[in-house]
Amino acid sequence: MTKAKSDKLTLKHIIGYGAGDCGGCFGLYMVSMFMARFLQVNLEVNAALLATILLIWNIWDAVNDPLMGTIMDICFAKAKPGADKFRPWILASIPIMFVGMVAFYAVPPMLGGGFATIAAAFILKIVFEAGYTMMNIGMGSLLGNMA
């Protein structure tokens, strides 16, 4: 007699999900905790300008998250039957987050704190956060499918 397949999550799956989500959050907090200090102290960005940039970023982030979810749904609708919906996005986000985080803190101070420095830092933050959004939406949606 064959045993019925159980839909219960194993400890391996629970730990694997938690470890994956922890990795993404670790990267986000590395950038978020030190970003303002790095930009002000190392790159000499004015605090008022930094606050304005962060306001603009948060408005973009409010639009970006649903947009990324829609892109994932559209791409999955065109995928072959049986294809993973979230795994490709989670795996693609890893190098994007890594490159974005390393490059963000490698913005050369020789740019002098002017427009070039601010633009470079802002673009690199967008790159990092795009990778984080890909990973976070994939992981968050995966949780609903696992349950």
How would you describe each model-predicted region?
Residues 2-147:
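Membrane-embedded alpha-helical bundles of multi-pass transporters/translocases
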